[in-house]
A protein has these predicted regions:
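Feature captures the catalytic cores and cofactor-binding loops of soluble hydro-lyases/lyases
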Residues: 1-166, 180-225
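C-terminal binding/interaction regions
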Residues: 170
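Channel- or pocket-lining gating/hinge segments that regulate access to a cavity or pore
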Residues: 176-178
């Protein structure tokens, strides 16, 4: 996929509510990809979409010796590209943060669209001020350098029971997070965009004074199922 194609899909999915994407996946008979139990750092943050750039982390296997094994900066500088969305699996570790404002700013300047982690973040006011959407398990003031090491990049990870592969499409908004398998990106988009258009017509008919049943029937006739 070219850089232009990647950004095309990012822009298309950034225009879709997660509810429409989830409904499309249900309608296509795909395994549900909703990541439950994580929360936006800013309730007013914008919708974001991007290709999963996965990072697997765990507790350090050696005591702190002055060497930072988390390697966040190196991962961002060496691995990310425009249209990515950082997905960091910490296996539920929540007593330290996996990142803060400096890493978020560097990622944003690299064209990364946002961050998703089952760990914690810090400096969330600054991250929100950067307009960098992020979902996490919570917040923690302590940094990761003393406690965490990165053991894999661009590897399969599981967040809250959902398997995420490198290159999957991640969609995040104030409702939640949905993961679209990389091989189904086009198919899910076509269905989700049709659902979105149909709902727009339902709203228009409701504002005209029609009942919900009438509005749904009219919208289905206009847009299709």
């Amino acid at each position: 996929m070219t850089a232009e194609e990647r950004m095309m899909w990012v822009e298309r999915y950034s225009a879709l509510p997660t509810g429409n994407v989830a409904d499309a996946m249900d309608g296509l008979g795909l395994k549900r990809g909703s990541v439950l139990g994580l929360y936006p750092i800013d309730p007013s943050q914008k919708r974001a979409a991007g290709f999963a750039r996965t990072v697997l982390q765990k507790r350090r296997s050696t005591p702190w010796d002055g060497v930072n094994l988390a390697k966040h900066g190196k991962v961002i500088d060496d691995k990310t590209e425009p249209g990515d969305l950082l997905v960091i699996s910490m296996g539920g570790i929540t007593d330290v943060s996996t990142g803060g404002d400096l890493l978020a700013l560097r990622a944003k300047l690299r064209g990364v669209q946002g961050e998703l982690t089952d760990g914690c973040l810090r400096d969330v006011d600054d991250i929100a001020a950067f307009d960098f959407p992020a979902y996490s398990a919570g917040t923690a003031p302590n940094k990761s350098a003393y406690d965490i090491e990165t053991v894999g990049v661009d590897v399969p990870v599981t967040l809250c029971g959902v398997l995420i592969l490198p290159g999957d499409m991640i969609v995040m908004d104030r409702t939640g997070v949905v993961v679209v398998p990389s091989g189904k990106i086009a198919e899910v988009y076509e269905s989700a965009s049709r659902i979105a258009k149909r709902e727009e017509r339902v709203v228009a008919h409701l504002r005209e004074g029609k009942t919900l049943t009438e509005s749904r029937k009219l919208a289905a006739a206009e847009v299709g199922q």
